[in-house]
Each structure stands twice: as C-alpha cells, then as structure tokens.
C-alpha cells in the first residue's frame, strides 16, 4: 500500500493549493495592517498596594498595631512572595508582591482574595484607623501626558480648563483611565487668634460644630399635595466664601460675626502635598491611559484629533505641551523594528539567490513571505502585536525557517540532476526529508520551551518570542512540504544537468578538512572537548546582566531628601537645579518636575514611586541618544557636588521589569536599632568598591519630635483630656476641617487653624489656652511639659522584619552582577559576624535576574525531555541520540568567544538565545545523522556514508548558518537584542563547523568505523 505523500497530494490538487496560497498571502497582508503596535509587550505587575491611616500615631505605633496585623494576615496567602512596607507617622503602605511564577490569569482573583482577607481583620485595628485602601491597578499606564500652563490665569481657572479637557478626552474611543496631575486643591482658611478667642471665652471646636450643623445636608422629607409629591429643601448650605462671611455665631448666649473671631482667606492647601512643573513653569498635567487590547496607533490618532479641538477652544495665554506621546514613540520604534525585519528578509533572499541560482532562489523568495503571511494571521488571531519581542522573534526565525525551503529546493534540484522528472523530484522532498525536517523543527521549538513556560515577569515579557518562533517554524515546515514542491514544479526547469561533477575549491577544501578530522578522530574530539572546557572557564570573564537600559532619550532623576524634609525644601532644591542646569541646556528638549510625588507610569517598565513630601522626580527628555549619556554625566556630577545630604540619582529607563538602583543589599533583623547599626557598617563594605557611587540607605536617620507629656492627674482635675489637647494642637498647627463649600464640581474644605505667627512657634503652643470643664481657660503649659525627642520617621519592613536597603549606582559599563561577584568575599565575611536572626540579602538587578532565571532552570529538564523524546521517535537509538545531543553544548565555544570579542554581557535575552541554539544545532545534527543512516541502509560503506552525507549536507547547513547569522546583523545594533545576536551568531558559526567536522569524527569513533574503508570503497568504484 502506498503511503500518504503530502507533496504528491499538493500536486494532485494544484488549483486548491494555489487558491489557499493566494488566500494566505492576502490574509497575511491584511493581518499585518491590523496588528497592534507597541514598543514593548505587556507584562503583569504582580504588586498590590495597601494603605491605611491612623492619625496621631507614631511610625512605631502604626507598625505594631496596623502594619504588623496586615502583614501577618497576608502571610496566609499561598502565592505570596514577600511583603514590603513603609510606615510613617500616621500612615502605612504595604506592598504585596506575588510569586514570580504566579500566572497572569490568577493575579486578579488573588487581589480579590486579599481584599476579603484584610476585611476579616478590620475589627482588630485600633479605634481611629482609616482604611485599609487597596490599589490593585498599580500597573496602569498613562502613555499620553499633556502639561497645561498659563500666563495670567489662577490655578483654579487653569484647573477648570483641564477638567473640561478631561471630559472631552473621555469621549475618545478606547480611552482608559484619565488623571489630573499637580492640581492644587482650594481651601478656605478660618484663621483664629488663640488669645482673642480665649479672651472672649470662645471654643474653636464650638465654632466648627456650628458651621457643620448649618452646612449639613439632611433629608427633609416630602409632602403629598393632592396629585403632586413635593420635596422639601432646607437652605443654609455654604456655596461660596461670601456665604461664610455672612455667618453670625451664637456661643454661650452671645452673637458674634464669624469675621470678628476669624480671618477668612480663600487660597490653596498650604503646604501643598504635590507640585508639577513643565520647563520650570507651574503646570497642571493630564495623564491619559488606553484600554487594554486597543490599537495604540489608532488610539493616538483619535486622541490627537480630540486634543486639537481642545486646544482650539482654549483662551489666549493657555499653552498645552506634549510631555509624553507613547503612540509616536511606538510608531517610531515599530518602524525601526520593521526596517530591521525587512533588512533581514533582504539578506536571506540575497543569500538564497546567490547560493541557489535565480530559479531555485525564486522558490525560496516566495516561500519566505508565505510563511510570514501565515504567521501574521496567527499573530492577529492570538492577539500578539508588533513590538520589540515579536519582531525580534521573526528576525531570529528567518534564519531558521529558510532552512526548510532550502532543504526542499536542494532536494528537488539534486533529484533533477540525478535524472528524475520534475514531479518525482518534488514528491521525493516529502519521502526523504519531511520527517527529519519535522523532527528538527519540533526540537528547535522545544529549545524555546523555557520561555513559553516561564511565568515570571521577564518570562511574560518575552513570551511572544516563543509563540512567534514556534508558529513560524511549524508553518515553515508545512510550507516546505505542501507549497514549496508546487512552486518548484512551476518555477524550476523540467530537467537539469549536474553542477557537482567537479568539486569547487571550497568543497575540495572542506572534503580535505573532513577527511583530516575523521582520520584524526580522537585528536578532533580531544581538541573540541578541551576548547569547550576553556569556554566554560571563559564564562567567568563574561559580564552578567538582567535587562539592558532603554534606548530612549529620557533621563530620570529621583530626589530623596532626608525624611524630615518639608515639601518646601524639596521644591527649593529641585527648582534651583532646574534654573542652574536645565533652563539653558541646549541638549535638553524639555523636562517635567514632580515634587512630593513621582511621575505617572508612562511606560509599563517605569519604576513608580509612592508620594512623599521629601521625594521628587525630574523627567528630562534629551535631544537624542548621542547627547543623553553626556548630559547624564554632567547632571550627576553637579548633583553630587551641590546637594550634599540629598540622594539625587540620574538613571535611564529600563527595558523589561524595573529594578531601581542596580546594586542593592538588604539588611534585616528583629531590632530596628541593631539593623540601623549593621546597615551603616555594611555601607562601609559596599563603599570599599571603587566602581560604586551614589550609595544611600533607604531609611536610617531619626528626626526630632516634640513630646508633650500630659500631667494626667492635673489635667483630669481641670476636666481636660489628652484627646482635647491633641485636637486643640492639631487645630492650631495643621488645622481641622470644619466643613466643605460645594463649589461646582469641587468640594472646598473649610479649615480652622491658628494664625501663622502663632502656629510656627513652640512657645505659642505652650501658651495655648485650653477650655476647662468649668468654663475657664488654662495654658497648655499648666497641664503638660514639652521636651524634644528623636523618633524614627520611617520604618521599612520586608516579611515583617525591619529592613534597610543599601543601594548604589555603578560607574562605567561594568554590570551589577560583576560588582556583586567581586563583593561576595567581603559580604560573606560580614555575614559571619552577624548576630542570630540578622541577615544580608542581595537585591536589585542581580536578584531580579535570579528570579527570572529560576523558572528557566526549573523548566530546562522538561525541555531536554521533550527534545530527547522527539529525537528518540525519529532515531530510535540511544547511540544516535547521544551523537545528536553531543554537538549542542559545544556551541558555548562560539557564544563565549563572541561575547568576549564584542564586550557584550550575558543577559536574560542572551540566555534565551543560547537555549535556542541547542535546538538549532540539534536540528542540523539529526538531519545529518538520518542522512548517514539512510545511505548506510542503501548499502553504502559506513565511512563513505559519513563522508557522502556530510558533504551533501554541508551546502544547506552552511547556507542556513549564513542566513541565520547574517539575518541577525540588523538587530545586533539594538541595545536589547545585541548581546543575544552576538551570542547566537558566535554559537551558530562554531556550532555549524563542529556539526560538519566534530560530529562525523565522533560518529566514526563511536561506531568504531575503520578509516581504510573509504580507500577500499574508492578502489572498488574505480574497478
């Protein structure tokens, strides 16, 4: 019975196959146009932020009573990696980090479970705790940010315009979250003179209660008047500052105009919680996000059109500046990636035409676009967009998928030269190479399994690499056995003369080298193993990396002032920096300043910071990569010299998951003071390394507080409680919210506080007049003593242990992993002297890299098992299985050599490339071994079979290697892909050479084939 032949079936149904070929090409072109565009693929931020407030409590009290309860409950979560918390006076912020292996689909249900878990313990918190509140949208991206500035308008007038713009933007199709950034909230201040109201016998709290009672909105009821139901409305609510000024107070049976006891001022919240500037001008920002899954370029076009309408309606003097425009960035990035893809396609096609000739090259030239077209269809169906990873995967796959087409065409040409007719030559492709090619394809795909099954953020980031390469390679095999034979029958001549009767010069040289390697088999094997051993040792000289920095022009400056710094001081330092270094800098396009807060997440890999009055962020957009690094060096030098005591660090954007400062160590233990002391000592260990700079501890310095010791017996005798004193003090210093004025869409707080001259002096506070239970007043100093004390303003914890992180930047191109390796002996010595319960852990880029590589190592056995199973099905021999596997590790020789020569690091992506090399080399090896076995089964002498098979496979293997290597050149210029491209090029070149020389030598050595058999075979042939 004749076995099924897919190539023969295609020739029997030519019209149908042609039809599907045309359909796939048209569908591929349509899908390519419709595919989404992104700069980088999405990955799930597996972080939730929980916040809670306990006004009046110290950082240590909040830690014990609130933070610890939350963290203890969270430890019941199975998918929890760790908790990290920042606690300050009156507030805690807990970061919940899930295990890197948590699947993206399980993240949202986990957030819901956390909400329920914390709800269960809400009753355990002290009285007065507000919250907890949950932010499970920590990964929201605001790709478009606009800054509104004005000349002559008030903040309120400008904010009205921004709010109107926000309403207009919300009508754009696929718009997501839209936030207003840097808007100053209005407030109406009732500023009392404490001496005056004390002299009048007026209690400030009584004034506040009167205002609250008048402004309350309470149900008044309905009246059924015949057929109508009429609502009752009571007037008296405050709608403006004027309505407050007209109030008369009745206190202690006396009437007072409110203006007699308080100065009424309308302004902005003082001090502000956050400020925003564009190019040094006060501004209000509009941060705009897009719904997930939408086409970013289409969204950008719609947003641009809407913003043009918004700008056209703005009054003269209001300017709108584009701060961040992700659609434009993506358009430029995808254009660059696409250009690299077409360059790679051109390189592969040129190689095909040069090596195969015009007609055979034309078959390959049609097959490759067909494979890409079908791949684009699958990408669109799977929701994979065109971005850095998917386009890079297509470029990597190009050099591999051309192999199938070349093998098919080479086989057809060989059969035509042997005298077969065109149809038999075409069908022979399937019978002789289909299953070895399929085995090679599946083995190559299996090499990418560690990427496909890696659930870490890095694995999710690179997941489309696995999908696109797997799809394109499998499609390539289908095209090679289904469409390529039909193309060959149509394009190739019906008969061909042999071009190989006389060997060319290169083929003759190769034959001589092959014979030498096989005759000196053990020398070949020992030399290969020896050089392989040297390459393993050479890996120690290759620098390690997680993900490289971005190739975007932005510079990010994180400002971390001492924790007790005011927002005024943070603003002063940042404004001075802008004036002296940015305002007239010709290398800078524009900059934005965020005081008291960080910038919104304008790209997914941006490291978002929590709001803090002692923190600020400057985002600088330089005029290009050619000046970016120069500007960075200049700015960092100025900051280090000018702002002593401030950690102002200039950094680049990350590609992939953010890591912050590159070199980090954590010191943890049960006692805060001991952890502080140890962290200071460890800072000395890190400081000994000459390549570390801008070292900082994320918390350490204590700050001054005024401790008010209440004389409880005396206070109780006078009818004054600690709560009364705290409320009175807060009303004097920060002010207490009396009520709210409902002004349009805004709620304006009415805040009662002391006059500026009284709230800024400790002496004034000591003389604060307190109302007693008998209606008299006494000074605060009569019932309390004042003293200064040092208190920890911030407490960072990790897994419920006080933890201080020592962070540092790296000078020059040295990678963080290299620094950590060099510090390891000193760190180990330091750890030996630690008390029980204290530890030092590495963090930063090195830890993130380990977290990403851990899942790869866990899945590697599955990859090897899949490869071995596929090969065993094809080879059905342990000996041949060993021979095929033996070549793959030797690619490390080329990998190490290429990385050292190019001074490129072994990053996460380069590791993925090395894993892919295993499949690529095994693919070539299995086809060669199958060819040898096929010739031996036809009766050819073993030695001659090895020689003939190797010489026959030399040309397609060399062509594939050339195509794969040269196709990587366009992406070797990329910061992200460069190390992987160099690693793969080196591995392919060396691995190919060893496949053609080392594998035959190993084969004849393993099967103990005597070298004289070739001579006997040649003699027999001549006879």
Language model: regions and residue ranges:
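Signature of alpha-helical transmembrane segments and their immediate interfacial
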Residues: 1-37, 431-433, 499-547, 588-589, ...
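Solvent-exposed, membrane-proximal periplasmic/extracellular interface segments of envelope transport
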Residues: 4-6, 61-136, 195-216, 237, ...
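Extracytoplasmic/periplasmic membrane-proximal domains and adjacent transmembrane bundles
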Residues: 9, 51, 122, 168-346, ...
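Transmembrane helices with small-residue packing motifs
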Residues: 15, 23-57, 105, 119-128, ...
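Solvent-exposed, non-transmembrane alpha-helical starts
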Residues: 19, 58-65, 102-113, 142-146, ...
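Hydrophobic transmembrane alpha-helices and their membrane-interface caps
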Residues: 27-34, 346-413, 865-953, 958-974, ...
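Helix-loop junctions and hydrophobic alpha-helical segments within the transmembrane domains
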Residues: 323, 330, 334, 409, ...
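Transmembrane alpha-helices and their membrane-interface boundaries in multi-pass membrane transporters
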Residues: 398-412, 433-453, 460-500, 618, ...
């Amino acid at each position: 019975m004749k076995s099924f032949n897919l190539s023969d079936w295609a020739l029997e149904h030519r019209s149908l196959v042609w039809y599907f070929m045309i359909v796939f090409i048209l569908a591929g072109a349509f899908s390519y146009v419709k595919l989404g565009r992104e700069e980088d693929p999405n990955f799930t931020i597996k972080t939730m932020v929980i916040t809670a407030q306990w006004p009046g409590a110290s950082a240590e009290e909040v830690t014990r009573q609130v933070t610890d309860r939350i963290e203890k409950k969270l430890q019941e979560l199975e998918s929890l990696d760790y908790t990290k918390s920042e606690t300050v006076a009156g507030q805690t912020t807990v970061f919940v980090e899930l295990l890197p292996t948590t699947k993206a689909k399980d993240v949202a249900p986990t957030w819901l479970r956390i909400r329920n878990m914390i709800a269960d313990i809400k009753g355990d918190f002290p009285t007065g705790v507000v919250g907890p509140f949950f932010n499970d949208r920590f990964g929201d991206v605001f790709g478009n940010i606009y800054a509104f500035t004005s000349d002559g308008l008030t903040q309120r007038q400008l904010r009205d315009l921004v709010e109107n713009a926000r309403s207009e933007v919300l009508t754009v199709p696929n718009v997501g979250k839209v936030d207003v950034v840097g808007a100053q909230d209005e407030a109406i201040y009732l500023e009392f003179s404490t001496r005056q109201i004390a002299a009048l016998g007026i209690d400030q709290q009584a004034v506040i209660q009167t205002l609250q009672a008048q402004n309350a909105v309470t149900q008044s009821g309905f009246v059924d008047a015949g057929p109508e139901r009429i609502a009752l409305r009571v007037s008296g609510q405050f709608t403006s500052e004027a309505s407050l000024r007209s109030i008369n107070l009745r206190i202690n049976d006396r009437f007072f105009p409110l203006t007699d006891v308080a100065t009424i001022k309308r302004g902005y919240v003082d001090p502000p919680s956050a400020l925003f500037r564009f190019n040094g001008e006060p501004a209000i920002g509009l941060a705009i996000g897009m719904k997930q899954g939408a086409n970013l370029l289409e969204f950008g076009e719609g947003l641009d059109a809407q913003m043009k309408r918004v700008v056209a309606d703005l009054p003269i003097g209001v300017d709108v500046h584009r701060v961040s425009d992700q659609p434009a960035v993506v358009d430029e990035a995808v254009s660059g990636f696409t250009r690299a893809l077409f360059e790679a396609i051109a390189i592969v096609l040129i190689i095909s035409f040069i090596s195969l000739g015009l007609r055979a090259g034309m078959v390959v030239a049609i097959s490759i676009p067909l494979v890409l077209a079908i791949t684009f269809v699958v990408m669109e169906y799977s929701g994979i967009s065109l971005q850095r990873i998917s386009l890079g995967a297509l470029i990597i796959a190009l050099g591999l998928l051309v192999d199938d087409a070349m093998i098919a065409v080479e086989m057809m040409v060989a059969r035509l030269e042997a005298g077969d007719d065109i149809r038999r030559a075409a069908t022979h492709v399937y019978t002789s190479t289909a299953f070895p090619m399929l085995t090679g394809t599946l083995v190559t795909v299996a090499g990418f399994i560690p990427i496909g099954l890696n659930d870490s953020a890095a694995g999710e980031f690179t997941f489309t690499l696995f999908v696109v390469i797997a799809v394109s390679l499998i499609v390539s095999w289908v095209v090679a056995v289904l469409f390529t034979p039909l193309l060959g029958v149509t394009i190739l001549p019906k008969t061909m003369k042999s071009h190989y009767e006389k060997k060319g010069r290169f083929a003759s040289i190769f034959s001589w080298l092959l014979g030498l390697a096989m005759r000196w088999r053990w020398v070949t094997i020992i030399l290969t193993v020896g050089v392989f051993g040297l390459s393993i040792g050479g890996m120690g000289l290759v620098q390690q990396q997680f993900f490289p920095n971005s190739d975007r022009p932005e510079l990010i400056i994180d400002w971390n002032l001492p924790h007790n710094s005011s927002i005024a001081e943070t603003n002063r330092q940042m404004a001075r920096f802008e004036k002296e270094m940015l305002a007239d800098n010709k290398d800078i396009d524009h900059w934005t300043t965020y005081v008291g807060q960080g910038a919104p997440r304008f790209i997914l890999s941006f490291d978002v910071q929590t709001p803090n009055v002692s923190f600020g962020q400057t985002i600088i957009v330089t005029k290009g990569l050619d000046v970016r690094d120069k500007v960075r060096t200049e700015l960092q030098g100025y900051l280090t010299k000018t702002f002593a005591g401030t950690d102002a660090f200039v950094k680049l954007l990350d590609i992939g998951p953010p890591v912050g400062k590159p070199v980090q160590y954590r010191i943890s233990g049960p006692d805060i003071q001991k952890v502080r002391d140890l962290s200071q000592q460890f800072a000395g260990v890190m400081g000994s390394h000459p390549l570390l700079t801008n070292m900082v501890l994320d918390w350490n310095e204590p700050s001054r507080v005024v401790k008010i010791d209440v004389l409880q017996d005396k206070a109780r005798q006078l009818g004054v409680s600690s709560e009364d004193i705290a409320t009175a003090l807060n009303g004097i210093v920060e002010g207490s919210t009396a009520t709210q004025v409902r002004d349009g869409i805004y709620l304006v707080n009415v805040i009662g506080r002391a006059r500026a001259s009284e709230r800024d002096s400790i002496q004034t506070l000591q003389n604060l007049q307190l109302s007693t239970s008998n209606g008299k007043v006494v000074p605060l100093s009569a019932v309390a003593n004042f003293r200064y004390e040092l208190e920890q303003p911030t407490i960072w914890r990790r897994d419920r242990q006080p933890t201080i992180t020592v962070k540092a930047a790296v000078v020059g191109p040295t990678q963080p992993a290299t620094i950590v390796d060099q510090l390891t002996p000193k760190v180990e010595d330091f750890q030996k002297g630690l008390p029980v319960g204290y530890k030092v852990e590495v963090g930063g880029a090195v830890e993130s890299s380990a977290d990403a590589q851990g899942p790869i190592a866990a899945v590697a056995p599955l990859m090897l098992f899949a490869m071995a199973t596929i090969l065993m099905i094809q080879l059905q021999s342990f000996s041949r299985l060993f021979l095929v596997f033996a070549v793959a590790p030797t690619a490390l020789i080329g990998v190490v050599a290429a990385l050292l020569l190019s001074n490129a690091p072994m990053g996460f992506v380069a590791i993925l490339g090395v894993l892919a090399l295993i499949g690529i080399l095994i693919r070539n090896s299995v086809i060669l071994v199958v060819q040898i076995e096929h010739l031996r089964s036809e009766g050819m002498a073993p030695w001659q079979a090895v020689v003939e098979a190797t010489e026959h496979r030399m040309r397609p293997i060399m062509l594939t290697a050339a195509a794969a290597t040269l196709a990587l050149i366009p992406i070797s210029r990329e910061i992200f892909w460069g190390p992987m491209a160099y690693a793969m090029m080196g591995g392919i070149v060396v691995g190919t050479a060893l496949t053609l020389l080392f594998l035959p030598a190993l084969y004849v050595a393993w099967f103990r084939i005597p070298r004289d058999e070739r001579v006997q075979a040649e003699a027999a042939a001549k006879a």
